[in-house]
Swiss-Prot record:
The gene is rpsL. Coiled coil: none annotated. Residues 108-118 have a biased composition (Basic residues). GO terms for cellular component: small ribosomal subunit. PANTHER family: 30S RIBOSOMAL PROTEIN S12 FAMILY MEMBER. InterPro entries: NA-bd_OB-fold, Ribosomal_uS12, Ribosomal_uS12_bac. GO terms for biological process: translation. This is Small ribosomal subunit protein uS12. GO terms for molecular function: rRNA binding; structural constituent of ribosome; tRNA binding. Part of the 30S ribosomal subunit. Contacts proteins S8 and S17. May interact with IF1 in the 30S initiation complex. It comes from Nocardia farcinica (strain IFM 10152).
Length: 124
C-alpha cells in the first residue's frame, strides 16, 4: 500500500484495456489472402466439421477466421474481408469472414438473415 506522499509524487497507473481483435489494428474490417482453407472440430459437447481459413491480413498478421453459412467457394489465394467476432466452440478463432464481399460469394438459397450472409433478395 503506497503512502499519501508516494501517491502525490507518482500517482496511480491507469489500467490499459486489451483489445479482443488485435490483428485488425483498430479497423472495423481488414482485407486478407487465404493461405489455407480447412475444417476443424469444435470443443467438447459439440460435434461438427467447422469451416475455417488461415488468412494473412494487410496488417501482416496471420489469423484463423471462421467461414459462416452453408457452403463456400474459398480456396488458397482468395481475397477475403475479415471482421471481429469469435466462435465460442473453436479455440483460437476470433475473426469471421464477411460473406458476399471480394472473392467470397454469398450463401445460396438464403431466405432469412440475408444481410449477414451476403445473399441477394430472391426475384419473386
Amino acid at each position: 500500500m503506497p503512502t499519501i506522499n508516494q501517491l502525490v509524487r507518482k500517482g496511480r497507473r491507469d489500467k490499459v484495456a486489451k483489445t479482443k481483435t488485435a490483428a485488425l489494428k483498430g479497423s472495423p474490417q481488414r482485407r486478407g489472402v487465404c493461405t489455407r482453407v480447412y475444417t476443424t472440430t469444435p470443443k467438447k459437447p459439440n460435434s461438427a466439421l467447422r469451416k475455417v481459413a488461415r488468412v494473412r491480413l494487410t496488417s501482416q498478421v496471420e489469423v484463423t477466421a471462421y467461414i459462416p453459412g452453408e457452403g463456400h467457394n474459398l480456396q488458397e489465394h482468395s481475397m477475403v474481408l475479415v471482421r471481429g467476432g469469435r466462435v465460442k466452440d473453436l479455440p483460437g478463432v476470433r475473426y469471421k469472414i464477411i460473406r458476399g464481399s471480394l472473392d467470397t460469394q454469398g450463401v445460396k438459397n438464403r431466405k432469412q438473415a440475408r444481410s449477414r450472409y451476403g445473399a441477394k433478395k430472391e426475384k419473386s
